[in-house]
């Protein structure tokens, strides 16, 4: 690669080294394509550096602290002391290990790595602005391009992140001390996961949500289990309110929230906090690409529409991950990255979003895949459902975590599995079994007749499938 006015070329240009981008680059290199990967920050993107991995590290650490302090029922008496700075250092070590691992994987695969930013000059060329030693720029022609620039936290008016008291999820993963009082704006999955972390660590947590339910994208019977557990941890919810403004007072922030619907609430509320976490969603990073110069279309929210092969309106330009729209999940981006690389190499490939699982790492966890019962009915199907409560699971009881249930949805005519929802212990792990079943076109009988190890949480999946067939042993059918 020559730096300067010389124009170089590549078979595949990948912009962004998050879960979608680096996977796309490695897969394309495996398929004998010449690949250049451009990244302006740390390898791994938001997921590895400011999202999935660091948040799960803090979720794990806070879980250990919480369980140690609440195990009297088991005859264990402890009063753990949390050194948040040490927990953050451990978290950062995990991130560093994985970041360096990604760089090594890319290098070993033969991917050409560039540190810098990319701006489209036209639909076949970008300008690379280098960072670090040897700063400069160059033009790079490409046969195909994969845009994987990810997303960033949404700011709301009046709550800019320039003041240290107002933070996004990025900042909330790097507090130097546990806030005595924390206000979270937004009860989606990010807000609820971080409410779980800091309530476990001892913060007085208040959550403001515009709608009348925590986790509003989930069914109420699932969300209510998580909300009730959060309330037992001390989280205070204010539903039907929006954050209006804030003011500094005695070193703290006083937030004013107004009713989202004046018919439901007749007065404003004020909440005092050391930190205010704004967790109202994420927006795509497309505004730095000069994307119009490539002729790539975006929608009103800035996302890049794609088809099932991850193609944009330009046949040789692809988009994967958060920048391509909901659901914004790291593993979705990785799968899309694989598909885009394979399509570029001439292989038949497409993304099956029906078998795409999702997880929320609250307490208890949530895992979902495929259709809900209502979604299936709205598509003209006749769904049949089976459920099994963890209260009847020997393994859940022996883990002292018997909240929640497994629900499986299938078509009545064929008994083909089309969806599932799990709320309970290890839901994020359990949902993968049902995702695999959907991917394979499996039926309820396939799950129900598969012997599951006893005692395990996975037995609940077998029992739920059998319940849908009126053959469950450990519950009424």
UniProtKB/Swiss-Prot annotation:
InterPro entries the record matches: Class-I_Pyr_Nuc-Dis_Oxidored, FAD/NAD-bd_sf, FAD/NAD-binding_dom, FAD/NAD-linked_Rdtase_dimer_sf, Lipoamide_DH, Pyr_nuc-diS_OxRdtase, Pyr_nucl-diS_OxRdtase_dimer, Pyr_OxRdtase_I_AS
Protein's UniProt keywords contain Phosphoprotein: no
Key words of the record: Cytoplasm, Disulfide bond, FAD, Flavoprotein, NAD, Oxidoreductase, Redox-active center
Needed co-factor(s): FAD
Cofactor comment text: Binds 1 FAD per subunit.
UniProt: FAD binding residues: 39-47, 56, 118, 322, 330
Cysteine pairings via disulfide bonds: 47-52
BP term (GO), one: 2-oxoglutarate metabolic process
Group of enzyme by EC: oxidoreductase
GO molecular function: dihydrolipoyl dehydrogenase (NADH) activity; flavin adenine dinucleotide binding
Matching Pfam families: Pyr_redox_2, Pyr_redox_dim
Subcellular location: Cytoplasm
Binding site for NAD(+): 186-190, 209, 279-282
Gene Ontology cellular-component annotations: cytoplasm
Reactions it catalyzes: N(6)-[(R)-dihydrolipoyl]-L-lysyl-[protein] + NAD(+) = N(6)-[(R)-lipoyl]-L-lysyl-[protein] + NADH + H(+)
EC number, as in UniProt: 1.8.1.4
Enzyme active site: 454
Subunit comment: Homodimer.
Family: Belongs to the class-I pyridine nucleotide-disulfide oxidoreductase family.
Extra remark: The active site is a redox-active disulfide bond.
Alphabetized PANTHER family for the sequence: DIHYDROLIPOYL DEHYDROGENASE, DISULFIDE OXIDOREDUCTASE
Protein name: Dihydrolipoyl dehydrogenase 3
Species, as recorded: Haloarcula marismortui (strain ATCC 43049 / DSM 3752 / JCM 8966 / VKM B-1809) (Halobacterium marismortui)
């Amino acid at each position: 690669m020559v730096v300067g006015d010389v124009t170089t070329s590549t078979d595949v240009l990948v912009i962004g080294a998050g879960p979608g981008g680096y996977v796309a680059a490695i897969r394309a290199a495996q398929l004998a394509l010449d690949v250049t990967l451009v990244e302006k920050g740390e390898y791994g993107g938001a997921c590895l550096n400011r999202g999935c991995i660091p948040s799960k590290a803090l979720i794990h650490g806070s879980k250990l602290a919480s369980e140690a302090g609440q195990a009297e029922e088991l005859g264990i008496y402890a009063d753990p002391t949390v050194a948040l700075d040490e927990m953050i250092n451990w978290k950062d070590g995990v991130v560093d290990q994985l970041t360096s691992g990604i760089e090594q994987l890319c290098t070993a695969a033969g991917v050409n790595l560039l540190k810098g930013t990319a701006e489209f000059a036209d639909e076949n060329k970008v300008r690379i602005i280098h960072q670090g030693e040897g700063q400069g720029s160059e033009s790079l022609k490409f046969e195909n391009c994969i845009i994987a620039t990810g997303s960033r936290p949404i700011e709301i008016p009046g709550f800019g992140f320039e003041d240290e008291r107002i933070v996004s999820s990025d900042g909330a993963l790097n507090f130097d001390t546990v806030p005595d009082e924390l206000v979270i704006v937004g009860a989606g999955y990010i807000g609820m996961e971080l409410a779980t972390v800091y309530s476990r660590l001892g913060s007085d947590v208040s959550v403001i949500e515009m709608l009348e339910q925590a986790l509003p994208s989930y069914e109420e019977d699932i969300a209510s289990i998580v909300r009730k557990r959060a309330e037992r941890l001390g989280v205070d919810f204010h539903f039907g309110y929006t954050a209006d403004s804030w003011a500094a007072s005695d070193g703290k922030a006083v937030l004013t929230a107004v009713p989202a619907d004046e018919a439901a609430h007749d007065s404003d509320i004020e909440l005092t906090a050391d930190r205010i976490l704004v967790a109202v969603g994420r927006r795509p990073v497309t505004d730095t690409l000069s994307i119009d110069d490539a002729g790539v279309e975006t929608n009103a929210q800035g996302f890049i529409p794609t088809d099932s092969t991850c193609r944009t309106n330009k046949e040789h330009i692809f988009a994967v991950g958060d920048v391509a729209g909901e659901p914004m999940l790291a593993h979705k981006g990785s799968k899309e990255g694989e598909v885009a690389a394979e399509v570029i190499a001439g292989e038949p490939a497409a993304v099956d979003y029906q078998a795409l699982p999702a997880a929320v790492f609250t307490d208890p966890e949530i895992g979902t895949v495929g259709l809900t019962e209502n979604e299936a009915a709205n598509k003209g199907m006749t769904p049949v459902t089976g459920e099994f409560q963890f209260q009847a699971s020997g393994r859940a009881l022996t883990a002292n975590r018997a909240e929640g249930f497994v629900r499986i949805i299938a078509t009545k005519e064929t008994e083909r599995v089309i969806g599932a929802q799990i709320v309970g212990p290890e839901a994020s792990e359990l949902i993968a079994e049902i995702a695999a079943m959907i991917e394979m076109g499996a039926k309820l009988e396939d799950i129900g007749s598969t012997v599951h190890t006893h005692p395990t949480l996975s037995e609940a999946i077998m029992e739920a499938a059998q319940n849908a067939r009126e053959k469950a042993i450990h519950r009424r059918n």
